[in-house]
Amino acid sequence: MMNANRIPIRILGLDPGLRRTGWGVVSVEGSRMSHVAHGVIVPDEKGEFASRLLCLFEGICAVIDAHRPDEAAVEEVFLNTNAQSTLKLGHARAAALIAPARAGLLVAEYSTRLVKKAVVGTGAADKAQIGFMIARLLPTAGKTTADCADALAVAITHANLRIANRRVA
């Protein structure tokens, strides 16, 4: 039982990246989950760093305005061997956290490993396995890119864990 009150809610999942930020929106009513929309925000790779972050922020704000989610969930940063890349990814995550917070949404964060375990059943799942499970869980989503599948997986994880977390609290 995902939504005990049976009041439909929309959840925005975000897979932040400086080159491509995937987003996905799901609707949850009771134990039923359905696909609303998904896409990718792609800043100009040749643009200045600050302009690329602004593009991500404004793109996420536009998604929020268009799809009116009630809550948001963002994938946490994984550590890279390149510290500079990890730092830049952290900036992209900041944009992904601030945009929904600015809109007044509850924002949750989940590790990549937890998202994989929640959707596929193992924290070591690869991109193909995530894509396969997204197609099974949200058949109306159609074919998704890896970024979109990851974002939808984050939204699904939040949908499943939000009720469990409330039961514990």
Curated annotation (Swiss-Prot):
List the protein's name.
Answer: Crossover junction endodeoxyribonuclease RuvC
Q: What is the lineage of its organism?
A: Bacteria, Pseudomonadati, Pseudomonadota, Alphaproteobacteria, Caulobacterales
Q: Which GO terms describe its molecular function?
A: crossover junction DNA endonuclease activity; DNA binding; magnesium ion binding
Where is it chiefly localized? Answer: cytoplasm
Residues at the active site = 15, 75, 147
The protein's role, per its UniProt record? The RuvA-RuvB-RuvC complex processes Holliday junction (HJ) DNA during genetic recombination and DNA repair. Endonuclease that resolves HJ intermediates. Cleaves cruciform DNA by making single-stranded nicks across the HJ at symmetrical positions within the homologous arms, yielding a 5'-phosphate and a 3'-hydroxyl group; requires a central core of homology in the junction. The consensus cleavage sequence is 5'-(A/T)TT(C/G)-3'. Cleavage occurs on the 3'-side of the TT dinucleotide at the point of strand exchange.
| Compartments (UniProt record) | Cytoplasm
Q: What UniProt keywords are attached to this protein's entry?
A: Cytoplasm, DNA damage, DNA recombination, DNA repair, DNA-binding, Endonuclease, Hydrolase, Magnesium, Metal-binding, Nuclease
What catalytic reaction does the record list?
Answer: Endonucleolytic cleavage at a junction such as a reciprocal single-stranded crossover between two homologous DNA duplexes (Holliday junction)
Q: Which Gene3D superfamilies match?
A: Ribonuclease H-like superfamily/Ribonuclease H
Reported cofactor(s): Mg(2+)
Q: HAMAP family, per this entry?
A: RuvC (MF_00034)
Q: How does it assemble?
A: Homodimer which binds Holliday junction (HJ) DNA. The HJ becomes 2-fold symmetrical on binding to RuvC with unstacked arms; it has a different conformation from HJ DNA in complex with RuvA. In the full resolvosome a probable DNA-RuvA(4)-RuvB(12)-RuvC(2) complex forms which resolves the HJ.
EC class name: hydrolase
Q: Family, per the entry?
A: Belongs to the RuvC family.
**Record organism:** Caulobacter sp. (strain K31)
Ligand binding (Mg(2+) 2): 75
Tell me which EC number(s) this protein carries: 3.1.21.10
